[in-house]
């Protein structure tokens, strides 16, 4: 379970997140909604251990994220899919996927893998699961945007994290490819009973692929409810900065 207890974060005296408390159960698929600057990325970075809260605590299965080593300890619990993907363009698909294992390897094994790839069967299986098994030796820069998204997802599979964080995972894709990736992402996390927490800018994707929606505006939680209760009225209120959002009970 992911728990944020009284968590707050500010930058240069400006609140990015006001104190909030959230409990996210194992296997949930949670969509973070809200206008730009609402605190979605800050919330993901807190859960992922990228930044520390100014107050409160973030725990994963009862373990304080701030106490975890950013290598093996954190990698086994949290995997992150950034909008920029963080792939190395000049490296092969295989080497980019193996990067998901670096948190588990010694420095020596990591260096050896550059010339003698490690755990190749695992990499092949990850590519098979994301639907591009023939791209193993392809240079990553030669792939389409959709294929690069799948490589980033395969790297998450290789990492083996129990919680997957995705920051606008389909922002750079056209509608058809966005649907394809969301279908693939949610299928994989569901099959593995992983927890998915993603910031999403397209509300119909939140309704179609997630079980729970959390609305943020100006660093505050405006609603937290099952997606089946996510009405147009609630969404219009969230994105209309001149009016307060309609409230909903979970």
Q: Where do the PLM segments sit?
A:
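Conserved ABC ATPase signature
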Residues: 139-143, 147
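Conserved ABC ATPase "signature" region
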Residues: 109-135
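Helix-to-loop junction immediately C-terminal to a conserved catalytic motif
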Residues: 48
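ABC ATPase NBD coupling module
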Residues: 64-79, 113-116
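Catalytic Walker B motif of ABC-type/P-loop ATPase nucleotide-binding domains
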Residues: 164-167
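H-loop/switch region of ABC-family ATPase nucleotide-binding domains
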Residues: 200-201
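Helix N-cap at the start of a conserved alpha-helix in ABC-type nucleotide-binding domains
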Residues: 175-177
